[in-house]
């Protein structure tokens, strides 16, 4: 605080030479320290007492020995003399306020030597060191710094309190010695070991700090970058660098040839080889008999690589459903389709017919669509996938039109109306029976109309669709025939 105040007071002076040599330029401005002698002596006494108390408090830290107390008293006396000589209370106005006399400098040097010999912390925390005296100008401040000659020469021109900031941190090792056990992150905290003698050399040589791990640890192309570290560093630093390099270097070595060989034809050829054919088992090739109207496929040749001997044997032993899984057509297991696929190109005539026969022995029914054949096969197997979702019903049906017909019993919908009397019915066969009563003995016509109505019900069984009737029922009967019925 005192050093900062003195620096602020001495800064507005014109020049150091004018302060020490000429009194005319020194007395032009306003200077707060040039007051009455009583106030000047009071301020000097206050500063001296504060410095003496500071010296005593610093001496009390040394353990309370008699030699330390004597050294502290000498330092306090030297400081009082220094302050009294520096501020020159009642002196001639021509003398500089901050010029240090040779006697005060010698006294301060003696006090510093006594304090250095008695205090174990004098090398690091001694306040009163030998000041660096500037010849003629009187502008040099008291030097703090370390106890060695090199440190005192380097820091002689620094203030007392600021000089400790720039000193080496290695001096603190005498106060707080490190534990002998090595820390796992020792090389991160400090690059040098506290026990090595070259610690100060490494720190002064401009080595990287503890947060500078080095630019090489990111460089994955140089996994041996730890060899560039100084030899005086802790051995754990080399291990850390190696551990940092090893994961990235390992990945670099493992995948070094990936960009060159993974996408080349030589490296990917094993995917298409017979040994690696299992990778493409889920994607079956399109069989030549899949499309009935297509020409014979060139893949069916003996020299084709896709249909080699190995895959052909696998396809022959696998079920037809898996072989035709990705053929683009609905799977059909009827005897006609199996025969057409077995014949290959020779079975094109069977495929053009589009006939799907029931394979159950003794049935022999034939359908033109695979969906109709599947619906027929449910009669044989007893499968009923269509369930009524009406409340407390849950009935199951084989065909969707049967389910739609059943739902009309719940809703009460009557889709079919009589064209003569406009009477409505839920089912088309009921309407056909009713129309027979209007036709009067037209058994053949009535039976034909009933069959057509039943087919209409089966084909157009979607709910909400408009009622469909046969053309005969849509035509109004002749008046004479109706009169005869009446």
Curated annotation (Swiss-Prot):
* Intracellular or extracellular location(s): Nucleus
Q: Where is this region: Disordered?
A: 1-46, 136-157, 294-324, 432-486
Instruction: Fetch the InterPro entries from UniProt.
Output: Znf_C2H2_sf, Znf_C2H2_type
Identify the residue span(s) of motif 9aaTAD: 208-216
Entry's transmembrane regions? none
Gly residues: which segments have biased composition? 136-149, 439-451
Its main subcellular localisation, reduced to a broad class, is nucleus
Among the record's GO biological process terms, what is one? Answer: proximal/distal pattern formation
Q: Which UniProt keywords apply?
A: DNA-binding, Metal-binding, Nucleus, Repeat, Transcription, Transcription regulation, Zinc, Zinc-finger
Q: Does the keyword Nucleus apply?
A: yes
Domain of life, per UniProt, equals Eukaryota
Q: Where are the zinc fingers (C2H2-type)?
A: 356-380, 386-410, 416-438
Q: Where is the composition biased (Low complexity)?
A: 16-25, 36-46, 294-305
The cross-references to Pfam families, in alphabetical order and at most eight, read: zf-C2H2
Single GO molecular-function term? DNA binding
Naming one, the record's GO cellular component terms include:
nucleus
How are the domains described in the entry?
Answer: The 9aaTAD motif is a transactivation domain present in a large number of yeast and animal transcription factors.
Q: What does this protein do?
A: Transcription factor which plays a key role in limb development. Positively regulates FGF8 expression in the apical ectodermal ridge (AER) and contributes to limb outgrowth in embryos.
The entry's family comment says: Belongs to the Sp1 C2H2-type zinc-finger protein family.
The name this protein carries in UniProt is Transcription factor Sp8
What species does this protein belong to? Mus musculus (Mouse)
* Gene (name only): Sp8
